[in-house]
Amino acid sequence: MSRVRERIAASRRGADSLPSPNIWRWPEVYEVENRAQDVTGALWRTLAELVDWAGRDVVDIGCGSGFHLPRFAETARRVTGVEPHEPLVRLAGSRMADNPAVTVVAGSAQRIPLPDASVAVAHARTAYFFGPGCEPGLVEADRVLAPGGVLAIVDLDVRHRPYGKWMRADLPSYDAGATDRFFADAGFECRRVETRWRFETRADLEAVLGIEFSASVAARAVAEVVGLSFPVGYRVLTRRRPTGLIVT
């Protein structure tokens, strides 16, 4: 089973913490992947346009090894990384050990160990919030968000080639339209963003594609990439918690 398929299947089952087999099993390779992603900065620019975290409290849900925590910590007042996999909790804690404004805790999207209405921004990047099945996490994010706070979900766009084509090869039954409708019905706005992944060596590129896809699809992807870089599409989904009472 491909790594993407494992995550989607667990999401549909409503699992409390979704396995992220790529970073759980190969954290060193996933660190290479994180460094290769978004080399144009398009994702961070889009997030900054949609969400203001300067001087505010942020929670990064499914923070993994904490790769994105330093970026938030540059301007946020406080940053909390939440991660269900204990080895990654330790890695993220070590990464941020010298920054007193950042805390890393064990927890899940369904059980965020923070008080009600305690953060202005909840961020999740390619973690848990994949579509139907993530409703408990949406409720929990609303609980920890203060009125007017924003949940920002960054996920891959399966419609965007070539990466989306490779994803669909491993997920032939995946219904992108149903996923889009799910988030639209839940009140999210969607911004589609193209950025690039760029690697230092072909060996790095091949290793990363090897942990993201089944063996056959990874081999096809490696053969189709010329050089060290390729475009990748993302969806940046945002939903703001209402500031007042909702009358129905």
Enumerate the language-model features and the residues they cover.
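Conserved class I S-adenosyl-L-methionine
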Residues: 1-56, 67-71, 150-180, 212
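Conserved acidic residues
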Residues: 56, 77, 120
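Class I SAM-dependent methyltransferase SAM/SAH-binding core
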Residues: 59, 64-111
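Conserved Class I S-adenosyl-L-methionine
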Residues: 65, 184, 189-248
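A short acidic, Gly/Pro-enriched loop at the edge of an enzyme's catalytic core
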Residues: 110-121
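A short SAM/SAH-binding and catalytic strip from SAM-dependent methyltransferases
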Residues: 120-134
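A short glycine-rich, Lys/Arg-flanked "PGG" loop and its adjoining helix->strand segment in the class I
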Residues: 135-147
